[in-house]
């Protein structure tokens, strides 16, 4: 088991990381709603997808702990 996997089996660590990612995602979505040019919107979309993927991976590795 990698160090990250070990950390992700700690409920508090999972909550903390997930909360930080969800806050970052909320900020991105808020920025997207404010608007910007097409290129900036694409960057925000890519970042949003990356954060959503990170959350999904954490939940998968952590075995659904939250």
UniProtKB/Swiss-Prot annotation:
The entry describes its oligomerization and partners as: Component of the heterodimeric YscE-YscG chaperone. The YscE-YscG chaperone forms a stable ternary complex with YscF/SctF.
Q: Which UniProt keywords apply?
A: Cytoplasm, Plasmid, Virulence
Q: Which GO terms describe its cellular component?
A: cytoplasm
**Entry's induction text:** At 37 degrees Celsius in the absence of calcium. Belongs to an operon involved in the translocation of Yop proteins across the bacterial membranes or in the specific control of this function.
Please state where this protein is localized: Cytoplasm
Functional description taken from the UniProt entry: Chaperone of the type III secretion system (T3SS), also called injectisome, which is used to inject bacterial effector proteins into eukaryotic host cells. Along with YscG, prevents premature polymerization of the YscF/SctF needle protein within the cytoplasm. Required for Yop secretion.
Describe the inactivation phenotype: Mutant is unable to secrete the Yop proteins upon thermal induction in a Ca(2+)-deprived medium.
Q: Name one Pfam family in it.
A: T3SS_needle_E
Name of the protein in its database record: Type 3 secretion system chaperone YscE
The record's family statement is: Belongs to the YscE family.
Q: What is its main location?
A: cytoplasm
Which gene name belongs to this protein?
yscE
């Amino acid at each position: 088991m990698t160090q990250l996997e070990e950390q992700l089996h700690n409920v508090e660590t999972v909550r903390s990381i997930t909360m930080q990612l969800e806050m970052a995602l909320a900020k991105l979505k808020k920025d997207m709603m404010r608007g910007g040019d097409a290129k900036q919107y694409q960057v925000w979309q890519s970042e949003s997808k990356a954060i959503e993927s990170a959350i999904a991976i954490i939940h998968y590795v952590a075995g659904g702990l939250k």
